[in-house]
Amino acid sequence: MHATYKSAIVRTGPNQVHVNDPEVYKNTFASASPFDKSRFFYSSVGVGDAIGAIMDRKQHHIRRTLLSPGLRANVILSYSPNLHKLVMNCADVMSGQARQAKSINLLRYTRSLTVDVIGDFTFGRPMGLVNEEDEMPELIRDLQDFSSQFHLWKHFPLLRKLVTAIPKSISRKWMPGFVQLREKSTAAVNEYLAGKQAGKPVSNTLKEGTFLDLLLNPPEKITSEAPKPSVLIDEGCAFITGGSDTTGFTMENATYLVLRHPSCLQKLRQELDEASRHIKDVFSPQHLLQLPFLSAVVKETLRLYTPAASPLPRTVPDDGVMIHGHFLPDGTILTHSLYLIHHNPNFFTNPKSFQPERWLGSSAKDLEQYYVPFSKGSRSCIGMTLAYHEIYTYLAIVFSRFDMELFNTTDRDMEWRDHFFVKRKGVLKVRIVRDRWSGEEFTSP
């Protein structure tokens, strides 16, 4: 679009423009930026009371201050034994599938794993999806359905009110993903509240308590009303969706890209083998986070396949703004695409090519300012540190333990469509050839 019109700024709607300029993006999304989130967009996403959809700056600051202690680096580090256990369980289940001569649908296992993790952080218990026997757990289907319908919500914001007002028997047929996701979040919140009322400890694995603990027990220095159940339910839906899809998508993509590039697989395998005692024997997430080539693979995957590829809308403030010679009056919706920033050839040579080495050279520091997979500023992804720990742990264990190959998966299968989060056109499958830790070899599906 920008190439067609030979302009960094293009009008995409009656009151909306898209700007493809990383420098403008930096100003728009800076912590002290006067550009607020677009009310039209964020009020339509179906979870209006969740942190990601709060538009009032003061209320957002309060909510982020309440939740941030549960996602600090030291908290996530203390959770690493539990994360390691969940990832190892996922690897064991995948190995069991291979033992039955079955291929592995990576979406099924990566999403199940990330839902289990975020369920532990939100409700105080993993959701148990990895160990479900269904070919695709119902909750994962709900998440996929919800994502598929996202553009309807975006363009018709009244749908949210309508879906919650009409009988469930109708709304469940019309918007099954959203309705069933909300029902599951409601059930989990009610179970949590009942446990609290009965005096049962909800979670003994999290240093600061669950997200619901943090919302219901604010520190004295923060003036905050007790959240209504609808707020807890919205946060539950938002954390399950945002905390599973983006992270699982990155795990899938990294697996595909490494298997698709044998030289990359060889380098990664060598690095992981040298660090095996920190992976297999005494698990050390601090050591994994320092592995240069693993880090480069993760960064390049997030650059190439930006999880939130949909343009992020902000509203021009009262005085208006001049961008590339065009005056935009107050109220204009200004959008930026993280995907386009990550694929800008002025900063990333051969931007469509998978080149982890670009993050290892002397110019890597210069690229960091254009690396924004979790956005930036005060509205950046609150769960970024947790996501990195999940991705590193998963990739380290899976590529240390298994010899794998792609199974009935083509480049066309990996093409994607924008549903705010990304939906793939096909299915990414792998075949586990051998368990390197046990020496067990598996027959082909």
From Swiss-Prot:
Domain of life: Eukaryota
Gene3D superfamilies cross-referenced by the UniProt entry: Cytochrome P450 (1.10.630.10)
GO function terms (MF aspect): heme binding; iron ion binding; monooxygenase activity; oxidoreductase activity, acting on paired donors, with incorporation or reduction of molecular oxygen
Cofactor(s) this protein cannot do without: heme
Keywords tagged on the record: Heme, Iron, Metal-binding, Monooxygenase, Oxidoreductase
Residues engaged in binding heme: C381
Pathway assigned in UniProt: Secondary metabolite biosynthesis; Alkaloid biosynthesis; Mycotoxin biosynthesis
InterPro entries named in the record: Cyt_P450, Cyt_P450_CS, Cyt_P450_E_grp-I, Cyt_P450_sf, Cytochrome_P450_monoxygenase
A Gene Ontology biological process term: mycotoxin biosynthetic process
SUPFAM superfamilies membership: Cytochrome P450
EC number in record: 1.-.-.-
Broad enzyme group: oxidoreductase
Described purpose of this protein according to its UniProt entry: Cytochrome P450 monooxygenase; part of the gene cluster that mediates the biosynthesis of penigequinolones, potent insecticidal alkaloids that contain a highly modified 10-carbon prenyl group. The first stage is catalyzed by the nonribosomal peptide synthetase penN that condenses anthranilic acid and O-methyl-L-tyrosine to produce 4'-methoxycyclopeptin. 4'-methoxycyclopeptin is then converted to 4'-methoxydehydrocyclopeptin by the ketoglutarate-dependent dioxygenase penM through dehydrogenation to form a double bond between C-alpha and C-beta of the O-methyltyrosine side chain.
Family from the record: Belongs to the cytochrome P450 family.
Protein's UniProt name: Cytochrome P450 monooxygenase penB
Organism of this sequence: Penicillium thymicola
Taxonomic classification: Eukaryota, Fungi, Dikarya, Ascomycota, Pezizomycotina
